[in-house]
Curated annotation (Swiss-Prot):
GO molecular function, one term: RNA polymerase II cis-regulatory region sequence-specific DNA binding
InterPro entries for this protein: Distal-less_Homeobox_TF, HD, HD_metazoa, Homeobox_CS, Homeodomain-like_sf, HTH_motif
Family: Belongs to the distal-less homeobox family.
UniProtKB keywords: DNA-binding, Homeobox, Nucleus
Pfam families tied to this protein: Homeodomain
Tissue: Predominantly expressed in the head hypdodermis, neuronal support cells and CAN neurons.
Cellular location(s): Nucleus
DNA-binding region as annotated in the record: 102-161
Biological source species: Caenorhabditis elegans
Name the UniProt record assigns to this protein: Homeobox protein ceh-43
Gene3D superfamilies: Homeodomain-like (1.10.10.60)
Length: 273
C-alpha cells in the first residue's frame, strides 16, 4: 500500500467526519497531513522541479484559521452555557465563567424611601419577614434591599454609639486630670515639709525633756561638782565664794574667769595652777 494514499484516505476521512472543507492545493502539489496541519511550501530541487515539504512558513496561514470564530468576542458570549443566572428573592445574581458572583450596581434610594425606612427603623431595628415584605412592596423595593439597608443602619448606629462613649470617657479623664493638683517631685515635697515645720517647737521640746531628766542644781551642787559642766555651763559666782579672782575650776586646763572690780564683771582667761 502506498503511504501517500493512506495519508490521503485518513485526511479525507478526517475532513468528512469533521465537516470542514479541506484546504485547496496551491498548484505546486502540496499536501496536508492530519498530523502536521500546515501547508507545504514549494521547494526547488536540483533538477528544477518543485517538491513538497511538511513544514510550513510563518507567513502562510495555519490550519487553525479554517475554523470560524465564535459568535462573540467575550467568553460569556462565546460560551453562554457557562454563565448562570440565580434569582434570589426577586433579584437576579449573575456569575461569571470562574464562578464568582458579579457585583451589582449600588442601590440609590430616593428621599421618600429613605424617610419611610428611617421612620420604620425608629420603631424597630429588626423586621420580621411579613413586615419586611410589606415594607418592600410599599416602597417598591426588593426584600433584599430593605434587609441590607437595615443591616447598614444598625452597624452605623453601633459605630456612632461607640464613638460617643469613647469621646465621653476622654472628657471625663480630662476633667479628673484638671481637678487633681499638681504634686511636686519627691525632693521638693520633703524640703517643703521641713521648711514648714517650726524649728522653735523642736528646740522647746528638747529643753523640756532635758529639764525633766536633769532638774536644776543648787549653787552648792554646782560648786561641789564643777567637772560635770564645761565652760559653756559655767555659772557666775559672787565674789564672796573665796576663789582666786572669782574663777571657776575647769578640768580642761583652760577656763574662763570673771573678775569683779568696782561692781563690774570682767571676763579673763587664765590657767589655774
Amino acid at each position: 500500500m502506498d503511504p501517500s494514499k493512506g495519508f490521503e484516505y485518513v485526511a479525507g476521512d478526517y475532513y468528512q467526519t469533521s465537516g470542514v472543507a479541506p484546504p485547496t492545493s496551491n498548484g505546486a502539489g502540496s499536501n496536508v497531513s492530519p498530523y502536521f496541519p500546515y501547508h507545504a511550501y514549494p521547494t526547488s530541487s536540483t533538477n528544477g522541479a518543485t517538491g513538497g515539504s511538511m513544514y510550513g512558513t510563518p507567513q502562510q496561514t495555519s490550519a487553525y484559521a479554517m475554523y470560524p470564530p465564535g459568535p462573540g468576542s467575550s467568553p460569556e458570549e462565546a460560551f453562554p452555557e457557562h454563565t448562570t443566572t440565580k434569582i434570589v428573592e426577586g433579584c437576579e445574581a449573575k456569575y461569571n465563567v470562574k464562578g464568582k458572583k458579579m457585583r451589582k450596581p449600588r442601590t440609590i434610594y430616593n428621599s421618600s424611601q429613605l424617610q419611610m425606612l428611617q421612620k420604620k427603623f425608629q420603631k424597630t431595628q429588626y423586621l420580621a419577614l411579613p413586615d419586611r415584605a410589606a415594607l418592600a412592596h410599599e416602597l417598591g423595593l426588593s426584600q433584599t434591599q430593605v434587609k441590607i439597608w437595615f443591616q447598614n443602619r444598625r452597624s452605623k448606629q453601633k459605630k456612632q454609639k461607640g464613638g460617643s462613649s469613647d469621646h465621653a470617657s476622654d472628657e471625663e479623664d480630662d476633667d479628673t486630670e484638671e481637678s487633681k493638683p499638681e504634686s511636686p517631685p519627691m525632693g521638693e515635697s520633703v524640703m517643703i515639709q521641713e521648711s514648714s515645720e517650726p524649728r522653735t517647737l523642736v528646740s522647746s521640746s528638747i529643753k523640756t525633756e532635758m529639764k525633766e531628766e536633769y532638774p536644776p542644781m543648787t549653787l552648792n551642787e554646782q560648786y561641789a561638782s564643777p567637772y560635770l559642766y564645761g565652760s559653756d555651763f559655767s555659772t557666775i559666782l559672787p565674789p564672796s565664794q573665796g576663789f582666786p579672782n572669782n574663777a571657776l575650776y575647769n578640768t580642761a586646763g583652760a577656763y574662763p574667769s570673771i573678775d569683779y572690780t568696782n561692781g563690774v564683771y570682767q571676763n579673763t582667761l587664765y590657767k589655774y595652777v
